[in-house]
């Protein structure tokens, strides 16, 4: 699961426990090692240096507790850390933990709803359900996509009972030109 070279790596936050954050920190090193190996290979082959964009969107669980530690850890590893509910657009992709419906306090719950509301390529988390929608923006003459990704979690909270058994756990990798995305399951890190 660490062999691919994505343009973007995106986590949607919501680290619910200290154990979960410790798991993420442990595996950040694996991401960094993969990137450093590829950069060394590019230098040796005199190719363009691989510099992926790593984005962490802080979630509602992160802001309930002191998230300065989370921010510090990820920033030290070169990640762009996005505050909760604050969208950021990088190379035409908008990232946010979750996005509200226009003029409302309610959040968009499906990828289709994200496209109908925001009319742009957008990646969000918040939910524990995966969803994808694609449409055509007449104004720009281009396809637009919305992806709802579950949160990176390794230790589902106790209150979920067995409800978490249906949750996909992991992270999203995105490649541009052509646009492709891959869901990476967290279990591959534990092998």
Where are these regions (language model features)?
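Short acidic low-complexity segments
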Residues: 79-92
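Charge-rich, low-complexity terminal tails
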Residues: 41-42, 58, 184-191
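Core catalytic region of metal-dependent phosphoesterases/phosphodiesterases
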Residues: 1-82
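Short, flexible, glycine/charge-rich loop motifs used to bind or transfer phosphoryl groups or to couple energy/partner
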Residues: 44-45, 86, 109-113
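Conserved beta-sheet core of the metallophosphoesterase superfamily
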Residues: 91-190
């Amino acid at each position: 699961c660490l062999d691919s070279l994505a343009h973007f790596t995106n986590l949607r936050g919501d680290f619910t426990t200290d154990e979960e954050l410790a798991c993420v920190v442990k595996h950040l090193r694996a991401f960094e090692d993969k990137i450093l190996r590829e950069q060394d290979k590019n230098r040796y082959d005199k190719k363009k240096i691989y510099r992926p964009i790593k984005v962490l969107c802080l979630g509602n669980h992160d802001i309930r507790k002191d998230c300065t530690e989370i921010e510090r850890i990820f920033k030290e590893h070169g990640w762009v850390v996005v505050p909760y509910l604050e969208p950021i657009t990088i190379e035409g992709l908008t990232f946010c933990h979750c996005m509200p419906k226009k003029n409302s306090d309610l959040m968009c719950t499906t990828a289709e709803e994200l496209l109908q509301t925001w009319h742009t390529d957008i990646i969000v988390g918040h939910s524990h359900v995966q969803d994808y929608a694609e449409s055509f923006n007449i104004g720009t003459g281009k396809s637009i996509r919305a992806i709802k990704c579950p949160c990176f979690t390794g230790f589902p909270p106790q209150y979920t009972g067995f409800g978490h058994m249906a949750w996909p756990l992991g992270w999203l990798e995105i490649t541009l030109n052509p646009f492709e995305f891959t869901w990476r399951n967290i279990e591959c890190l534990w092998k």
